[in-house]
């Protein structure tokens, strides 16, 4: 549902943020 989509978006954003910090 919508909540799952939102959680996926948040997880993607968090992962991208962490990856950007590390590299």
UniProtKB/Swiss-Prot annotation:
GO-annotated cellular components: extracellular region
Keywords assigned by UniProt, alphabetized: Amphibian defense peptide, Secreted
Secreted in keyword set: yes
BP terms from Gene Ontology: defense response
Keyword Glycoprotein: no
Location in or out of the cell: Secreted
Tissue expression pattern: Expressed by the skin dorsal glands.
Primary role: Has no antimicrobial activity.
Protein name stated in the entry: Dahlein-4.1
Natural source organism: Ranoidea dahlii
């Amino acid at each position: 549902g919508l909540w799952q989509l939102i959680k996926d978006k948040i997880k993607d954003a968090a992962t991208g943020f962490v990856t950007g910090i590390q590299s």
